[in-house]
């Protein structure tokens, strides 16, 4: 049932299809794929994030190409004009991520297994939220997706921080899907919001807490004073999928 020759232009659909035991359907993956590690050995890499090897994709004769967001619209348009079936997801929230997971599962005849795995994820998030509700206070959290210029948390990250018991310092920016619309032009805006915790995930670049702490005017930020600066690896938090 469903497509037999799938190309995954982003990492999360590759990871999900492997978890569902449907990796035999995958004929091409993103060059950024890290999970599962064996995917990089088993499958040809055909795309970055905003670029793809169109000729190589066409040569693989896919019956479905899976992509993510408006940033891959040009690639999708080119493939569609070549007669390729393309499905682009645009998940930005936790609910939309779970919906995407169900849709991909159903597409490959694994709706029941997808539902069971999604239910387990929901139960885990509910357990975390319940534990967080018992905390004495909700810390203010600044999540930095990039450092030059500073870019704050995308919506699903903001929501996950809330589930874990924190409050996003920039909740109004989290609603903006594009990174350019989450740029904080004046870094002193971050200082004024005085986060208790700073989490960095610099899109694959190593987070440098000492560099953040040394920024002009940041010495009085609570997170800096109390050394509450942490890194979450980008593949673990910035891929809108099962991770």
Question: Model regions: which residues?
Answer:
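N-terminal ligand-binding lobe of clamshell/alpha-beta domains
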Residues: 1-243
